[in-house]
Regions:
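Bacterial N-terminal signal peptides
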Residues: 7-16
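Positively charged n-region of N-terminal signal peptides that target proteins for export
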Residues: 1-7
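N-terminal, motif-rich segments that launch catalysis or mediate targeting to/interaction with membranes
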Residues: 20-174, 178-181, 185-208
Length: 208
């Protein structure tokens, strides 16, 4: 009985511990993206060489500009996109378009403190296919990535080509962020963990 009581006490003690969890943090998106790039065709085929870039995605001597003009390696551009997709502060509405209910095809719907909050379904926002929106108006969709790829392989000036290719890789990081969110329970169950519009901590902060 004493042994059983001690065992139960240990279980309670361990399960009561609180630890920092990065389940919904930007760093998690970057880690997942880094692994994805590491196991992608960019590492194992001639895809980059065929684009005129016969080097490793992590080569620090081979960089391209991101959307801020900072020179980054190819893998760093993916990581920038994965991080930037969550927006720049609580007034950025990009995160509200990261939800997708596979049962009904809807995006985010609901209210926060009486304010209606909604968003486009994540696949529609990320791909931007057959969208009435002006190309580039939402920024960093797969359609934008294709446009950047075209500019990066056709512009006569080297600087313009580098800018196009840099934005292409960063934009693919934005799209990968959506794929990751659609494999995360809150984003498919309409669970508003958003810090919108600056009304308090999201669920991830409470869990952490």
């Amino acid at each position: 009985m004493k042994a059983a009581g001690l065992h139960l006490s240990l279980v309670v003690a361990v399960t009561s511990l609180t630890i920092e969890c990065a389940a919904y943090e930007i760093e998690t998106h970057q880690d997942l993206t880094s692994y994805a790039v590491g196991y992608s065709l960019l590492q194992t085929s001639r895809k980059l060489a065929d684009l005129g870039m016969p080097w490793s995605p992590v080569d620090p001597d081979r960089t391209l500009p991101n959307s801020s003009g900072d020179r980054r390696t190819i893998v760093e551009l993916f990581l920038d996109g994965a991080a930037f997709e969550d927006g720049f502060g609580c007034t950025d509405d990009r995160p509200r378009n990261h939800f997708f209910n596979p049962l009904n095809g809807q995006g985010l719907t609901g209210t926060i403190l009486g304010f209606n909050v909604s968003g486009e379904p994540s696949p529609k926002w990320a791909v931007e296919q057959n969208s009435p929106a002006t190309p580039g108006s939402r920024g960093f969709s797969f359609r934008d990535a294709r446009d950047h790829f075209y500019r990066g392989t056709t512009r006569p000036a080297r600087g313009d080509r580098e800018t196009g290719l840099g934005l292409m890789f960063q934009t693919l990081g934005h799209v990968v962020h959506h794929l990751q969110d659609m494999a995360q329970p809150q984003h498919v169950r309409n669970d508003m963990h958003l810090d919108l519009p600056c009304v308090g901590p999201p669920l991830s902060d409470i869990l952490n």
